């Protein structure tokens, strides 16, 4: 059986921390920002953690 491939799009979007958690950037912070409040844009700048319910799917895409 051949090696399983890593999802290259996922590699560009997620980073695994030393403790095994997966970091991701927030969505909705690329364009059409004028109608979004400063408070909302400030919150969207922060790095988020992948939700426990999504961990398995993301881990399989990363194949670490």
UniProtKB/Swiss-Prot annotation:
Going by the UniProt record, its keywords in alphabetical order are:
Ribonucleoprotein, Ribosomal protein
> Which Pfam families does the record associate with it?
Ribosomal_L35p
Superkingdom of origin: Bacteria
Under Gene Ontology molecular function, one entry of this record is:
structural constituent of ribosome
What start and end residues bound the annotated signal peptide?
none
Read off the InterPro entries from this record.
Ribosomal_bL35 (IPR001706), Ribosomal_bL35-like (IPR021137), Ribosomal_bL35_CS (IPR018265), Ribosomal_bL35_sf (IPR037229)
In the record, the note on similarity to other proteins reads: Belongs to the bacterial ribosomal protein bL35 family.
Q: What is this protein called?
A: Large ribosomal subunit protein bL35
Source organism of this protein record: Coxiella burnetii (strain RSA 493 / Nine Mile phase I)
Upper classification of the source organism reads: Bacteria, Pseudomonadati, Pseudomonadota, Gammaproteobacteria, Legionellales
